């Protein structure tokens, strides 16, 4: 069977997004997606609500429960977990995820991480393309995956509806379970495109409002003005 869907994106259950569960479902149906791995920051609540919605309306979409957690070494994604991970100390985090039968993904390796090599050795897949990351660091992620002979994946890391289409993935699962295929199968990216600069500003402004951070808000306004003056606001990250 061929699976087509998204890995690593965010909804209104994240602190930097207002993307609704209903809009995610509509996107999936309109683009013939049959699996979704929603990975909100620090919580599986969004993924659980997504699954409830799919089950309520009996939709042909497989939902994998997961989240993106800020561990002691940086962001790591846990998929196929049953409850929120409690320990953020990296070694304990890994044990807890594996204890739940989960899968570990390494998102945007060269953005906000420490001990990158250590993380790479413990995860199941490494993200070699992130639409919110520049070309140079995506290339470094590809080399990292190759060095440790790790399976790979690509992600939109979408925080807005517009970004959802940046990275649709496809893989096949015939003689094994979906979860085993998600961990081991070769995943193809059908349309990897970078996000626009204004989308990053938008998500950070949402974060500043949800956290009531005036410092972050004004820093993003400043960045907005800078991008306008340099005519980059509506350009894709390069």
Task: Place the predicted regions along the sequence by residue.
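Divalent metal-dependent hydrolysis catalytic cores, especially in the metallo-beta-lactamase
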Residues: 24-43, 103-105
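Catalytic cores of extracellular degradative/oxidative enzymes
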Residues: 38, 66, 76-89
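Surface-exposed amphipathic alpha-helices with a cationic face
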Residues: 4, 51-55, 89-105, 142-148
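Charged catalytic cores and adjacent phosphate/nucleic-acid-binding surfaces used
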Residues: 1-11, 21-27, 45-51, 72-84, ...
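Mobile, glycine- and charge-enriched loop segments
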Residues: 1-15, 62, 95-101
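Short acidic, glycine/proline-enriched helix-loop-strand junctions
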Residues: 44-64
């Amino acid at each position: 069977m061929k699976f087509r869907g998204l890995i690593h994106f965010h909804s209104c259950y994240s602190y930097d997004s207002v993307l609704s569960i209903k809009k995610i479902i509509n996107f999936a149906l309109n683009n013939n997606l049959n699996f979704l791995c929603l990975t909100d920051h620090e919580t599986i609540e969004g993924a659980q609500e997504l699954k409830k919605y799919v089950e309520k309306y009996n939709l042909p979409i497989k939902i994998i429960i997961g989240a993106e957690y800020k561990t002691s070494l940086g962001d790591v994604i846990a998929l196929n977990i049953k409850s929120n991970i409690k320990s953020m100390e990296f070694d304990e985090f890994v044990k807890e995820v594996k204890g739940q039968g989960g899968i570990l993904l390494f998102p945007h390796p060269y953005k906000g991480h420490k001990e990158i090599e250590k993380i790479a050795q413990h995860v199941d897949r490494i993200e070699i393309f992130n639409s919110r990351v520049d070309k140079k660091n995506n290339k470094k992620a590809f080399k990292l995956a190759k060095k440790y002979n790790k399976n790979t994946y690509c992600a939109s890391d979408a925080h807005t509806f517009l970004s959802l289409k940046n990275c649709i993935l496809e893989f096949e699962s015939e003689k094994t379970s979906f979860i085993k295929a998600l961990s081991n199968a070769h995943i193809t990216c059908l349309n990897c495109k970078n996000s626009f600069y204004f989308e990053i500003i938008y998500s950070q402004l949402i974060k500043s409002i949800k956290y009531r951070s005036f410092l972050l808000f004004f820093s993003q306004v400043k960045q907005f003005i800078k991008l306008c003056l340099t005519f980059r606001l509506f350009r894709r990250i390069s």
